[in-house]
Design a protein with these regions (language model features):
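C-terminal subregions of glycosyltransferases and related glycan-biosynthesis enzymes
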Residues: 1-26, 233-328
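Nucleotide-sugar donor-binding/catalytic module of glycosyltransferases
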Residues: 2-247
């Protein structure tokens, strides 16, 4: 049994309280609670909810509205499914919304689904199958593909279906760079998520990476080699991604490598090298985003930045950027 006393906690302002149950009993046949933070997503929330409710192993879907001014709330209220719960969290941010939903979740497992994405058929079943084969795992994860605003597939990540990602003790690999890029591809054990304090609300970006690292510090991960999620690229989220720079991610790097729980579990003397690897990973990610949006001058600047940090890392970063250009 994992308790909050077993780990070093976040500050009180960021900490997730123990579960506060809604009047919905836990269902052993449907052990997953889906938490959806939502703000002005009327165009997509119906499709997102339908994809979650189509998963028979989902016992509840908790939508946390974060101050929507469009018809998001009305669309959620119109759905006649007893598994849907609506909460409000006035413009406190996505991390606070997720934490609030997690606090009130009754499921053994949590899945954090963005309100404009959609789960693929059988996604939750695939994750639970992997979980049964990994009883010590605190997080089970798979992979995703990308779709456009109309739901048409634009990514080609299916070409990588033979690729394996880390399982077991993944902390060292994860500290070097986030390979779980969307919460919709992962099940987090609710007890463990609450024990590590949930998402740090002080971080604007990469708060998920920090949380996954804390989870990896207390338990194992298991990879399920399936495409589980359609990650939607549309005007709002691509405009946001297009203006991010590597500097936007540095607070998360500092937080990860100043976290006592994480540092205590890293191999002695490894933190400096892993921090440098994480910085290179995030600059590479910035270059991948830039190439997707046709900002080729920024691509060259970011690759030059990587070369100055580590010439050995440059070829791999160039390959990743080239693959991103073709939706991989």
């Amino acid at each position: 049994m994992i308790t909050a006393e077993d780990v070093l906690e976040l500050t009180a302002a960021s900490r997730v309280a123990p579960a506060a149950r809604l009047p919905l009993p836990a269902n052993p046949d449907a052990p997953v609670s889906v938490v959806i933070p939502a703000k002005n997503v009327a165009a997509y929330i119906g499709e997102t909810l339908a994809s979650a409710l189509a998963q028979s192993q989902v016992g509840e879907v908790i939508v946390v509205d974060d101050g929507s001014t469009d018809n998001t709330v009305a669309i959620v209220l119109a759905i006649r499914d007893s598994r849907v719960r609506l909460m409000t969290n006035d413009s406190a941010g996505v991390s606070a919304a997720r934490n609030l939903g997690a606090r009130y979740a009754s499921g053994e497992w949590l899945l954090f689904l963005d309100a404009d994405d959609r789960l693929r058929s059988g996604a939750v079943a695939g994750l639970l199958t992997a979980a049964r084969g990994a009883p010590r795992a605190v997080l089970i994860y798979g992979d995703y593909n990308t779709i456009d605003s109309e739901g048409r597939q634009i990514g080609r990540r299916g070409l990588l279906k033979g690729r394996r990602k880390p399982s077991g003790d993944v902390l060292t690999r994860l500290a070097a760079g986030n390979f779980i890029v969307n919460g919709g591809i992962a099940l987090a054990r609710a007890e463990a998520f609450r024990a590590v304090g949930g998402f740090d609300t002080s971080l604007r970006y990469c708060e998920d990476w920090h949380c996954w690292c804390r989870l990896a510090a207390i338990g194992e991960f298991e990879f399920a080699p399936q495409l589980l999620l359609d990650y939607r690229l549309h005007t709002s989220n691509t405009m946001n991604a297009a203006v991010r720079t590597p500097g936007d991610f540095l607070p998360a790097v500092a937080r990860v490598f100043d976290d006592g729980l994480i540092l205590a579990r890293l191999p002695e003397g490894s933190a400096s090298g892993l921090r440098r690897a994480a910085e290179i990973h995030l600059v590479t990610y910035s270059a991948m985003q830039a190439v997707r949006f046709g900002r080729y001058r920024d691509v060259l600047a970011y690759l030059a930045m990587i070369g100055r940090r580590s010439i050995k890392s440059l070829p791999r970063s160039v390959v990743r950027v080239a693959l991103a250009r073709f939706g991989i």
